[in-house]
């Protein structure tokens, strides 16, 4: 572990880490966003989620391997710095920070919109501000308070999914009182299992892969737990059943109980199922659950941005002020920085929703894939090095190395290329490329400045300054 990590308090318990890892899987994308995938893919959406989930399982296994060797709040940014080069750590760290800053704004706006469902007269901007401030204070107080909030947010989501699965299976097989078995006729009765063709399933993977962003947060949190190797190992090994049960299982229930082309599935598949089986106030219940998912994501976003900025500051790749810790070991200035820029994005949504805010949202669109790609490449290089120098440090190992690592890299590159041919995603890919280019240029400026400072500090060696890699 990096020595500088000693400043962060190790207050996250195993139960916190377990729920943080679960929270990363269950988000609003499952409760709401899955409807568009089902509507465009049909029952084959189950395959889309399974294949995308498999890719994320591979990524998490690789990240778990590296985290068990070096559990740090910098996580994959630090690993990229060590394995690929400082430019990679700098670039992916700042891109990831930017991604979550925008996510915080999106979730604050989404949460405010849900609350307006019950309280119509409260302005959207005010509710967004209140939600952001409350969860900012939670994160500022201590890492333990972040963990507690995330624990209960996650518990609500887990209980909801488990209840949904139990009730769904009961209606499918006719175990529910007064019900007839629904069976699996809806899986093939409306044009077959792949009514829109295999190509729609592959397209679905491109859309679905973004729903899993957040699973990697547990590796960032590893730097603040007393037993990081055990926590990361458990989280990494359990990601398989979490994705299968929560995502694939839930989508299978939806397409089994309702025809895939039902209009109400597009709006909210979970509400559609609950209304279909006669659950009273289904919309109200799901609004509360989605609000919980949104607040969980907002809470995680505030935590994640602060720790990534803290890690960048440790490596002198961000202002050193973001390394300052409170008495409880919290990087307060790093948290406030994420909150500040996120609320600027909220203001942009109020004044310029179709230009500035849309640009910010689209420009962060493909960053998730870049993060996954960097994780895979870092693991490929680090694993080869560790096998030669310190093989006993490998407490967790990626399966079938290096074959599955190469396969994952190829799959991610394939998804990035396919985005260029999908009208609804082309802008996201292009704008993410623009933002990535800006960050890379910033690194070159940063490197040049560091070289100049080093030369000024060592005038004897000015003629042959050491160039950073």
Swiss-Prot record:
Keyword Membrane annotated: yes
MF term (GO), any: gamma-aminobutyric acid transmembrane transporter activity
Its membrane topology: Multi-pass membrane protein
Swiss-Prot/TrEMBL keywords: Amino-acid transport, Cell membrane, Membrane, Transmembrane, Transmembrane helix, Transport
Main localization, broad class: membrane
PANTHER family the record matches: GABA PERMEASE (PTHR43495), GAMMA-AMINOBUTYRIC ACID PERMEASE (PTHR43495:SF5)
Protein name: Gamma-aminobutyric acid permease
Organism: Bacillus subtilis (strain 168)
Encoding gene (name): gabP
